[in-house]
């Protein structure tokens, strides 16, 4: 954040969200630890056939270690796992146009750790199914209605109306159903490798910059496509 003063237009490099978070951190406000992948990386991503190059991947690993130390949690740890949110950060807000992924870092093993850590199995399983649904939709391209239909059918079978009436075992069953629908629609398994999850989520946010809805929004609001987005 000390380096922020040296950047002439931080929003151009870090995006609106990243620049504001960095500024708040510099002021000593209580901001959750994190890091921003700059708009320059977005440009490199598209020039590199829509892939993150090895230098960027290594830098992400370094920043992740710094974050782990600051929160005393480890990404993928089986006792106290670090969970991440991956969000877009254009220099001008584009509400609802770009993709976000929450609870990243959950898999079949870390969800058990989260359950033990929070003493709340229902919360842990619900968080995991939300992540699988978000990841399946945003990263793997499975339309959201497939997941919603599974939930509605499950509630009908159980004879309940609200998601809050589903318990830990119910969400456990739906987690399996969600994985099956991902496999059925994509012919790929939902990834258990959490670093693969992270890199794919970052790539998905960069790709959402060129989604149809984002292009239309930019056209209507005269936002240049070459600006790109940061990732927070």
Where are these regions (language model features)?
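Nucleotide/phosphate-binding sheet-loop regions of phosphoryl- and nucleotidyl-transfer enzymes
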Residues: 1-232
């Amino acid at each position: 954040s000390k380096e922020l003063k040296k950047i002439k237009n931080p929003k151009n490099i870090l995006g609106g969200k990243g620049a504001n978070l960095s500024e708040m951190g510099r002021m000593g406000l209580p901001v959750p630890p994190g890091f921003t992948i700059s708009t320059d990386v977005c440009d490199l991503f598209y020039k590199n056939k829509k892939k993150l190059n090895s230098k960027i991947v290594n830098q992400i690993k370094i920043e992740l270690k710094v974050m782990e130390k600051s929160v005393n949690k480890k990404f993928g740890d089986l006792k106290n796992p670090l969970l991440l949110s991956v969000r877009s950060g254009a220099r001008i807000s584009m509400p609802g146009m770009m993709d976000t992924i929450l609870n990243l870092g959950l898999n079949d093993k870390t969800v058990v750790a989260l359950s033990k850590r929070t003493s709340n199995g229902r919360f842990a399983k619900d968080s995991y199914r939300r992540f699988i649904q978000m990841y399946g939709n945003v990263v793997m391209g499975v339309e959201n209605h497939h997941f919603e239909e599974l939930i509605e059918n499950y509630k009908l079978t159980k004879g309940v109306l609200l998601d809050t009436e589903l318990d830990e075992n119910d969400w456990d069953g739906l987690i399996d159903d969600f994985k099956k629908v991902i496999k059925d629609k994509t012919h790929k398994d939902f990834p258990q490798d959490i670093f693969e999850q992270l890199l794919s989520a970052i790539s998905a946010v960069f790709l959402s910059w060129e989604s149809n809805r984002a292009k239309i929004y930019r056209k209507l609001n005269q936002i240049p496509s070459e600006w790109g987005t940061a990732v927070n």
